[in-house]
UniProtKB/Swiss-Prot annotation:
Cofactor list: a divalent metal cation
Keyword Kinase: yes
Protein name: NAD kinase
GO CC annotation: cytoplasm
Record: active site: 70
Annotated organism of origin: Solibacter usitatus (strain Ellin6076)
Keywords assigned by UniProt, alphabetized: ATP-binding, Cytoplasm, Kinase, NAD, NADP, Nucleotide-binding, Transferase
SUPFAM superfamilies: NAD kinase/diacylglycerol kinase-like
């Protein structure tokens, strides 16, 4: 990682922990000659430092510190977009599966990161496009997943699904989760999907409550192009990206998902390994 000249800070809203940390963190960085850019939420905790829209924070940054939970990290990832700037995620939330650095570890681990004594985990992004009448009307990059669900009342939806032009099936279910390896430990896991090691080049199709005993989750290569078309009435289906943004899907729209050429860079302490986090955060393998 290059020398850190400018660092960004993105924070969780309404967080007493962030309110306590932010002024000290800004001062800590400035004492080391590092310029600081903060979002408008963080400015509320800063004691007078002006903020900017979250999407502008990563501009000119060499590193972005994220103070919050996994939801804050997903929001920060969306703000960073395709810039591939390292994120230093500090857990102020609950589970904190991705934001696995604790408050107590903040300054020691940040000091190590500034010295280059850290590990960068690359998490592949997934591009999702909505095609309507042969035009791309919406495009998103997902870290975790793209989820197609019924938009309102409790009813099943019909989703014609293809992988590389090969017909998979017509899912009749509450929805369909298209998950990256990173997203395999999120919504997909709750819906019965497998845990995928982060470096495995795959995409997982996990139906939500399918009305068919044989509709099990399916892994496909990350080189695959997945196409899903709704057969329901207009706007009976909703597409959600990483649980935070989305758009209604009309009948005959096609949702196309494929692996992006870009990755999210997560700073990890050298000792922090995937299965350690599984055991600590998800109690995986406990008896």
């Amino acid at each position: 990682m290059p020398i850190i000249k400018t660092a960004g800070i993105i924070s969780k809203p309404n967080s007493t922990a962030a309110e306590e940390i932010v002024p000290k963190l800004i001062e800590w960085l400035r004492r080391r000659g590092i310029a600081v850019r903060i979002d408008e939420q963080t400015s509320l905790y800063s004691g007078g430092v002006s903020g900017m829209p979250r999407e502008e924070v990563p501009q000119s940054c060499d590193l972005v510190v994220v103070l919050g939970g996994d939801g804050t990290l997903l929001s920060a990832a969306r703000a960073i977009g395709r810039r591939e700037i390292p994120l230093f995620p500090v857990n102020l939330g609950g589970l904190g599966f991705l934001t696995a650095i604790s408050i107590e570890e903040l300054y020691p681990e940040l000091e190590r990161a500034l010295r280059g004594e850290h590990r960068i985990a690359k998490r592949k992004l997934m591009t999702t496009e909505v095609i309507r009448e042969n035009n791309v009307i919406a495009s998103f990059d997902a870290l975790n997943d793209a989820v197609l669900t019924k938009s309102s009342i409790a009813r099943m939806i019909d989703l014609d699904t293809y992988v590389d032009e090969q017909f998979v099936c017509a899912y009749k279910a509450d929805g369909l989760i298209i998950a990256t390896p990173t997203g395999s430990t999120a919504y997909s896991l709750s819906a019965g999907g497998p845990i995928i090691f982060p470096s495995v080049p795959a995409i997982c199709l996990t139906p939500i409550c399918p009305h068919m005993l044989t509709n099990r989750p399916v892994l496909v290569p990350e080189t695959s192009v997945i196409r899903v078309a709704s057969r329901g009435p207009d706007e009976s289906v909703y597409l959600t990206i990483d649980g935070q943004v989305g758009t209604p899907i009309r009948e005959h729209d096609t949702v196309v998902c494929h692996s992006s050429h870009h990755s999210l860079l997560l700073i990890r302490p050298p000792r922090m390994m995937f299965f350690d986090v599984l055991r600590q955060k998800l109690k995986w393998g406990e008896r």
